[in-house]
Every structure is written in structure tokens, then in C-alpha cells.
Amino acid sequence: MGLPGRRNPLLSARRAAASLRRSRRLPVYVAAVFFVASVLLMFRDEILYLTTARSPSSSLPTTGGSAGGAGLARKEELVSVNKPVLLGHGGKPEKHHSVTERHRPKVSAKRRPNKKAAKAARKKFMASPSVAAGAEVNVPETCNLSKGKWVFDNATYPLYREQECEYLTAQVTCTRNGRRDDGYQKWRWQPRDCDLPLAFDARLFMERLRGKRLMFVGDSLNRNQWESMVCLVRPALSPGKSYVTWWDGQRVVLHAWEYNATVEFYWAPFLVESNSDDPKAHSIRDRVIKPEAIAAHAGDWVGVDYLVFNTYIWWMNTVNMKVVRPTGKTWEEYDEVGRIEAYRRVLDTWATWVNDNVDPARTSVFFMSVSPLHISPEAWGNPGGVRCAKEDAPVQNWHGPLWLGTDWDMFRAARNASRAAGRVPVTFVDVTAMSELRKDGHTSVHTIRQGRVLTPEQQADPATYADCIHWCLPGVPDVWNLMLYARILSRPPAAAGHVA
């Protein structure tokens, strides 16, 4: 079949060839050649799409599983480090095709539905149960979503099933990796002064994303959140009309081409340039940053409609940071400065870029707060525990702060930087205190190390192998995304941001 709204190109080509034969002015073989050429011309859009947009994989490349800020896949874990990994909706393998960097697809370059198809899609959407019932999301901007409590809810949670989302990597599929309890999937966040939506309406959200790009930028916690988001929107994607590309690990993109939309992750663990920016060789002991240099990454952020930033976990290895001197030419020419000083310099660079380069009439900007670690069980009253291993419920009936080692100076610096963009409103999404209560939600020993699921012997040694940084999915990041969902859909497109 051709594209919607187009005449049948095969029939047109046949008629053209037949006309030539009837005219007796050309031999039959010339008419045949003309027929083939006509078919190729008529189907050029479909052929171009099939040969540039699809390739196979049995699964997405896995992320590094070590606790301590490990993020993207190691080189040996990638199907190919020079080719995109493509995964069709439904997990079916597709023909592999090499695509060079300069052929990286963009939303604007994808086939846009013609007016007839767009009208039909809109009519179908308006007739959907959620829209026909007058569904809407209206969470007041004045409501502080970060204050509340965790409520066990096995009726509406989890928001999706682990085994039904082919986009999840082995790092976060805790049930598949041997975790036997599933209570961690069934806790709903109840804000104190208002309500979050009970469900994530994927079709409603994808309609808001129609013709747009949503990009998570940062470290492996934002990658964790990206995986959650693509699972949440999955029910709105028709079979055969979405696929994932993995661009050398730097970007992972879900293409939902029936909506002409993308949901993307961009690897930039410090936001600015660093010697850890190569996703195939990022596990570097001596991490060095250029706190005033952001252009190498930021060029890929221009024009994105929804930007969700974070940076935290990669800062936590040392109390001092190595920063390249202003006149430095190599990564070896650095000075050591205090972590919070370096963090503030980076955030100043980021806020300046946002203020100078983002169009607030088009782009909404969010900054995710600190995602906490749970490596000190005595902090939540379990002195005999080992990191986050075997924790099966949130911290409950706790009054006062939890001393988990969260760097609250960095939290405040990020919040202040979100207010510093000036011309561009930035929504600071505060998930820190609520996530501190979720000692049960981490991948712990039900994850991977160097691309392989932990062995029984490794799982029996949580002091060495428990990952108490990243989160199981379904799980806590789904609630973070529900907060994004509430803020995005409660506003007109590109409305101003506030504190979530």
C-alpha cells in the first residue's frame, strides 16, 4: 500500500508502461525498464525510509551495572559501536543497516503525515475513551508535589509490566534477574495537598508530544528515567510504528513516527565537557571536567521541545573535583577544587546556555533533583543490614531527615540554578526526599555487572555487588515521570515552569 492520501503508484506506473507499449514507439523491453523506474520513483519515500531507518537487535544494549555512577554500555556490550541499534515495537528483529553519524535521523526529517492522515488520526484520538470521557490533567502549580507519603496500591500499580516492555535493559529488570518480591512496584506517591493522576494516559501524553521531541540529558539516573518513560508511553504506540535507535551510546532515541515524535536520552554525566563523555570508555578513575565548556553537548539540545536535565551521581566519588585550567590544552592540565564550587560553576554554565539558547515560547525545561543512594542501613534503623540488600518496603513512620549522605548543598545549588536562567522558566522537579524513603526500590543484587546478570555467588555478596544507586523498573522513576506528566499536561504547551 502507499502512504495515506496518495494515489496507487503501482497502478500509475503500469498505466504509463502500457501506454508506451500501445504507442508502438518503443520496444517491449524499454517499456519494462520504464515500468521498473516508475515504480522506484513512485515508492521513493517508502524505500528511503526502509533503507535508512531500520536495523535489528534482539534487545537494547545493556547499561553498566556497577554501583558508583556506571552508566552506559561498555564497548563489548554494544551490538555495534558504529551502527544504530534498532528495535521495533514488539521486539521483532529488523534488517540491520549501517548508518553513519551524518545520517542521524531528526524529527524534522521524518515523514510527516499528510493532512488527510493527520485529520484521521486526530479524529481517532478525539473518539478514544479517555478523551471522549473528558479526561484532563489539572494539577495546580501551587501544589508542592514533593511533600506527601507512599501509599501501597496494588490495584493501579505497577503502571506497566516488566515483561511487557521490551525497551527495558537488563540493568533494571529486577524480577527477570531473580528478585522474588514485587511489592516495590506497588507504591503510589500521594502528595499532601493535592493529587497526582492515578494513571499515566499514554495517548493523552503522546498527543501533547505530537510533532515534538522530549529529551532526557545527564547521567545514568536520567537514563533510568528515560527507560521508565518509554515504557509508560508504549501503550499509545501502534505495532510497527515505533523503533529505538542507539547512536554510539551517546543518544538513545525512541521514534514514534505515527506521532512524528521522539523520546530521547543524551549521555552527558556532567552536562559540561569531561574526559568521561565517551560512552564506550567512560569508566575513568580520574574524572576531569571543563566547567565552562558546554557547546560540544549543547548543540544537540537546540530546538528540543521538552528538556529534562540532571547531574549528580558522577560527582560523588571524591570531595574535590579536577577542573581543566582556563589555559589548559589537555586533560592533564587541571587544578583540584571543592566539589560544590565546581558544581556551581557547571550549573552557572548550564543556566547561561539555557538563558541564551532556549526559546521559552517553544521549549519547556526541567531539572531533576538529586536521586539518593541507600548504602547506610543504620540510617533507617537497620544496623544489621548490608547496603540496600533485602529491603522490601519503604521507610515508614519516620519523622525528621534521613542521613543517607545526600549532598544537600548540591541540591540547593541545582534548585538555585534552575531559578537563575532568568528569561527561560525552569521547573525544578524535587524527587529527593520522597525517594530517600524508598530503600526498597534499588536494583541491589538483581542487576548486571560488565554486561552480565550477577551470578548466585555475586548475589550472595551484597557488600561488594549491591547497586544502591539505580532503580528497578517498574518502580520509583515511574513516579518521577508521573510528576513530569502532571506538570506538562496541566499547562498549555510551552507554558512557564515552577517548582514541582
Swiss-Prot record:
The active site is at 220 (nucleophile), 467 (proton donor), 470 (proton acceptor). It is found in: Golgi apparatus membrane. Belongs to the PC-esterase family. TBL subfamily. Glycans are attached at residues 144, 154, 260, 416. Its main location: Golgi. Residues 44-500 are lumenal. A motif (DXXH motif) lies at residues 467-470. This is Xylan O-acetyltransferase 2. GO terms for biological process: xylan acetylation. One of its GO terms (cellular component) is Golgi apparatus. The chain crosses the membrane at residues 26-43. It comes from the Eukaryota. Xylan acetyltransferase required for 2-O- and 3-O-monoacetylation of xylosyl residues in xylan. Catalyzes the 2-O-acetylation of xylan, followed by nonenzymatic acetyl migration to the O-3 position, resulting in products that are monoacetylated at both O-2 and O-3 positions. It is an enzyme of class 2 (transferase). Expressed at low levels in roots and leaves. InterPro entries: TBL, TBL_C, TBL_N. Keywords: Disulfide bond, Glycoprotein, Golgi apparatus, Membrane, Signal-anchor, Transferase, Transmembrane, Transmembrane helix.
